């Protein structure tokens, strides 16, 4: 057996009973030499270079093996190839298997090995955990070939963590049989019969109606049910599911147990809520404008899997994959305890996310990269999401060759050290094992796991689509292919578990159940209310908080936040800045600037029992070095969070620097707040200009979710916005877009002019949380105004007064002929100009709340000005941007023909701002001068 050794210099390397361990280490060495000790690196390099002779020493009489180094090396290479590339030959395609070329060597013969040779080599050569299981290497390799080339394909060699990789290798290679008894197999078949029977019934009785059938990946439903069972075993009682439209109706029906009557009612356009279970176990919210049935979610409380679990399917727009970070945020909210001082305590066993992706959309949509990047970050981790790709190997009409540049749709997950299993959707019991492995891995390592459920799509993209127009060859084969219901049913018949008659009876029973459900529905009970009015709770704008504070109370809070541990060393330069926060309480001339107003607001909010969570790029310090919510010891780098030491704190405060992402982070915070409505979630953009990277979140969730789905959110956005000569990409948060989205009191949009109004606004928003009146808050937050003394206010403006939608400057109202309205920095620029150039004929008003537009408040001002001639709107943005186009109809209605109405601002522009700072100053001065002209 040593015929290849003639050119090899032999070295006496004999590992004896430790051979299996050493070969496992050698396997690690082949992947990453630095993963083993230095002395083993030297030894293994001699083996790799053909300089050593490795022999297994007999550990018991008559057993053991020896082989030349050439044979050992070939065995090792074969084993390594099977582990790394066996997935390329795995039996994971139910139909239309791809033709693969230029494959790595994966067969015994390709390594000049044979059965006889391998039968004389110990099984330990393959892996040490085989030594007590198989008699020799041939049996062990046979096992590995069946395992790695079977109905589950395994990819884990890309994982850098050696402990995780070793765990997966042992779990995969150790002989395992899913503990599925015949009763459970019957139940699996019954589930599949209901899954497919549901689709067949709808297909027959509602011809052409869109339902985005699950057929082809039907096993998704029993996989989800088994996941819930495994989660219950380790007492995970909150499951958050996110998915797009494909198969959604089936999941709603068979996982969330939405009654057939409700689902069929939606197809018949009758009122489904009449069939909502009376026990309250199923929560289905609805907005006043509504949404299509395959976007709707729900929440089911059930004890079907051993413990009481809350199973949520998130509402979802048509924008594929965009719900993923929302689900992650909802899960983290379910895991966080926020009802105590300090930062939240997180328990990964409280909740778990399941995200169901499409094979075309998973690599195609960047939101998946952003979301997976959150998975191991302290502020965002959920202890592992289960990702299931419902891989029907087509995206509408686009096949994989045109849809991605990778072998598998799951390849993007490799960059995040995530294990990947590909499983044949027609092998029911293999899909159950895939779930077992995933759940065991999550329990052990608290990390994400990806399962690629490889199937097909029985019909077109929707039920009106003819797929053979663009994909004739695949669909020729699909039409001839039996469904998994038939395949698994026949297998149970063949195994003697059920008879053919029993199989047919189960399938017939489903159709009878569906028909009985439809018979309960009154066809004449049509939904025909076109008014679709918003609820009473949204008839009024955000209401001020009426709570008053004493100066002593605010001083106590302020002092606590400026008191550090004795051994904590604040950077001296920063300490001087922070110490100035004592001045408002110690000096008549002391003013509370923007950052201090925010700190005081947050402190009083957590004292009221509302938790605060602030995230964004650089939010701990603040983009403009103003917040300093987390301090760093200048000597050792330790951190200290002043807001964790507020006296009488009843809820948590946390702040996190986010990854350089907008869409996923906004989606996460939105989801967190939807799940925990008593949490004040704030996302802060580095600059407001970058917020449009999350535009889908604003359009499809934040502004419209309540109207579509009845889903309440009180998410707050801080979007730094002001024209300060920094160019077109560091000036505008696109205020106009948020105003365009504003309707039906769905949000509050502000551009503030004072720190005290900011304080009262934050408290008003916090007060609304958890109520029917809660809604998103969009703040055009300041940049240079953060340190502006005109914006800063004395402490007595913080003790009472509440939020003011408008702020009217002092003036002799009898002399006023011109009313100038502005907001944010534009207002401050005008105020500072008029302070230097007084003019009694001009009255300046800060419109701090742009939406809902303060018509009533402005009308009161107009009525108090007997000699008024002109009303002017002044803004820094171009005429086609900013607030002008939004406020114009309101102002026109207010002034009528009684007063002149004028606009002052930049002319219409394609880009928001000038690129040159000096030109910016000229334009800004022109706006100011024109607005105060007689």
Swiss-Prot record:
Residues 515-537 have a biased composition (Basic and acidic residues). Pfam families: E1_dh, OxoGdeHyase_C, Transket_pyr. One of its GO terms (biological process) is tricarboxylic acid cycle. It catalyses: N(6)-[(R)-lipoyl]-L-lysyl-[protein] + 2-oxoglutarate + H(+) = N(6)-[(R)-S(8)-succinyldihydrolipoyl]-L-lysyl-[protein] + CO2. It is an enzyme of class 1 (oxidoreductase). CDD domains: TPP_E1_OGDC_like (cd02016). Residues 515-544 are annotated as: Disordered. It comes from the Bacteria. SUPFAM superfamilies: Thiamin diphosphate-binding fold (THDP-binding). Its cofactor is thiamine diphosphate. E1 component of the 2-oxoglutarate dehydrogenase (OGDH) complex which catalyzes the decarboxylation of 2-oxoglutarate, the first step in the conversion of 2-oxoglutarate to succinyl-CoA and CO(2). Belongs to the alpha-ketoglutarate dehydrogenase family. PANTHER family: 2-OXOADIPATE DEHYDROGENASE COMPLEX COMPONENT E1, 2-OXOGLUTARATE DEHYDROGENASE. Homodimer. Part of the 2-oxoglutarate dehydrogenase (OGDH) complex composed of E1 (2-oxoglutarate dehydrogenase), E2 (dihydrolipoamide succinyltransferase) and E3 (dihydrolipoamide dehydrogenase); the complex contains multiple copies of the three enzymatic components (E1, E2 and E3). This is 2-oxoglutarate dehydrogenase E1 component. The lineage of its organism: Bacteria, Bacillati, Bacillota, Bacilli, Bacillales. The gene is odhA.
């Amino acid at each position: 057996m040593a015929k290849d050794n003639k050119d090899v210099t032999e070295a006496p390397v004999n590992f004896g009973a430790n051979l299996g361990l050493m070969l496992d280490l050698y396997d690690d060495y082949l992947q990453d030499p630095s993963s083993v000790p230095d002395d083993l690196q030297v030894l293994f390099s001699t083996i790799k270079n053909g300089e050593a002779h490795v022999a297994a020493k007999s550990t018991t009489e008559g057993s053991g093996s020896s082989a030349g180094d050439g044979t050992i090396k070939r065995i090792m290479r074969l084993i390594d190839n099977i582990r790394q590339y066996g997935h390329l030959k795995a039996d994971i395609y139910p139909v239309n298997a791809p033709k693969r070329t230029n494959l790595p060597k994966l067969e015994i013969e390709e390594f000049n090995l044979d059965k006889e040779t391998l039968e004389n080599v110990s099984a330990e050569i393959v892996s040490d955990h085989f030594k007590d299981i198989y008699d020799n290497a041939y049996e062990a390799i046979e096992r590995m070939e069946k395992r790695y080339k079977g109905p589950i394909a395994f990819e884990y060699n890309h994982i850098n963590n050696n402990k995780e990789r070793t765990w997966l290798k042992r779990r995969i290679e150790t002989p395992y049989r899913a503990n599925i008894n015949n009763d459970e197999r019957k139940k699996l078949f019954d589930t599949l019969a209901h899954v497919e029977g549901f689709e067949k019934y709808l297909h027959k009785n509602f011809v052409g109606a869109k339902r985005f059938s699950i057929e082809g990946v039907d096993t998704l439903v029993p996989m989800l049910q088994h996941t819930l069972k495994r989660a219950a075993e380790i007492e995970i009682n909150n499951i958050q599911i996110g998915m797009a439209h494909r198969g959604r109706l089936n999941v709603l029906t068979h996982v969330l147990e939405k009654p057939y009557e409700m689902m069929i009612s939606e197809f018949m356009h009758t009122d489904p809520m009449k069939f909502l279970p009376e026990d309250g176990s199923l929560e289905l919210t609805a907005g006043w404008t509504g949404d299509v049935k395959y976007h709707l979610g729900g929440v089911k409380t059930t004890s079907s899997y051993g413990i009481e679990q809350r199973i949520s399917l998130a509402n979802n727009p048509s924008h594929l994959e965009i719900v993923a970070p929302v689900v992650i945020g909802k899960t983290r909210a379910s895991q966080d305890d926020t009802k105590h001082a300090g930062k939240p305590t997180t328990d990964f066993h409280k909740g778990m996310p399941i995200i169901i992706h499409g094979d075309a959309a998973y690599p195609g949509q960047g939101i998946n990269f952003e979301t997976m990047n959150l998975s191991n970050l302290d502020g965002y981790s959920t202890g592992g999401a289960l990702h299931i790709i419902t891989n029907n190997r087509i995206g509408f009409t686009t096949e994989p060759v045109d849809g991605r540049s990778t072998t598998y749709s799951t390849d993007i997950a490799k960059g995040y050290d995530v294990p990947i299993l590909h499983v044949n959707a027609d092998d029911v019991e293999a899909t159950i094992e895939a779930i077992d492995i995933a759940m065991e891995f999550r329990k052990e390592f608290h990390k994400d796991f990806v399962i690629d459920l490889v199937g097909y799509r029985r019909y077109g993209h929707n039920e009106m689509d003819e797929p053979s127009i663009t994909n004739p060859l695949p669909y020729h084969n699909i039409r001839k292919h039996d469904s998994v219901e038939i395949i698994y049913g026949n297998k149970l018949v063949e195994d003697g578990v059920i008879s053919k008659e029993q199989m047919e009876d189960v399938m017939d029973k489903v159709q009878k159940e569906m028909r009985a459900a439809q018979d309960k529905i009154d066809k004449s009970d049509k939904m025909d209310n076109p008014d679709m009015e918003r609820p009473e709770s949204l008839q009024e704008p955000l209401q001020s908080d009426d709570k008053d504070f004493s100066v002593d109370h605010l001083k106590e809070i302020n002092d606590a936040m400026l008191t550090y541990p004795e051994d904590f060393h604040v950077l001296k330069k920063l300490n001087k800045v922070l110490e100035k926060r004592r001045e408002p309480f110690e000096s008549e001339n002391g003013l509370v600037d923007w950052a201090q107003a925010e700190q005081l607001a947050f402190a009083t909010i957590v004292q009221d029992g509302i938790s605060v969570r602030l995230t964004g790029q650089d939010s701990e310090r603040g983009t403009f070095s103003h917040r300093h919510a987390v301090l760093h010891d200048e000597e050792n780098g330790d951190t200290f969070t002043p807001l964790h030491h507020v006296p009488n704190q009843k809820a948590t405060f946390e702040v996190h620097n986010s990854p350089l992402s907008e869409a996923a982070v906004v989606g996460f915070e939105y989801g967190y707040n939807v799940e925990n409505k008593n949490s004040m979630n704030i996302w802060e953009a580095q600059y407001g200009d970058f917020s449009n990277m999350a535009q889908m979140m604003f359009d499809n969730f934040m502004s419209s979710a309540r109207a579509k789905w009845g889903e309440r959110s009180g998410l707050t956005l801080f979007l730094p916005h002001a024209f300060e000569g920094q160019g077109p990409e560091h000036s505008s948060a696109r205020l106009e877009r948020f105003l365009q989205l504003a309707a039906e009191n769905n949000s509050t949009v502000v551009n503030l002019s004072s720190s005290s109004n900011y304080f009262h606004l934050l408290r008003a928003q916090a007060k609304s949380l958890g109520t029917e009146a809660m809604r998103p808050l969009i703040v055009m937050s300041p940049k240079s105004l953060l340190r502006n003394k005109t914006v800063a206010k004395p402490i007595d403006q913080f003790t009472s007064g509440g939020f003011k939608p408008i702020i009217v400057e002092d003036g002799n109202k009898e002399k006023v002929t011109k009313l100038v309205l502005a907001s944010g920095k534009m207002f401050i620029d005008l105020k500072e100009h008029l302070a230097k150039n007084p003019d009694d004929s001009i009255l300046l008003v800060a419109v701090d709340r742009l939406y809902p537009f303060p018509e009533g408040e402005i009308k009161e001002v107009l009525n108090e000005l007997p000699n008024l001639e002109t009303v002017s709107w002044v803004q820094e943005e171009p005429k086609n941007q900013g607030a002008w186009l939004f406020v114009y109809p309101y102002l026109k209605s207010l002034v009528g023909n009684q007063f002149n109405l004028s606009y002052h601002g930049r002319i219409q522009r394609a880009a928001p701002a000038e690129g040159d700072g000096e030109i910016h100053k000229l334009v800004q001065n022109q706006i100011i001068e024109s607005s105060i002209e007689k």
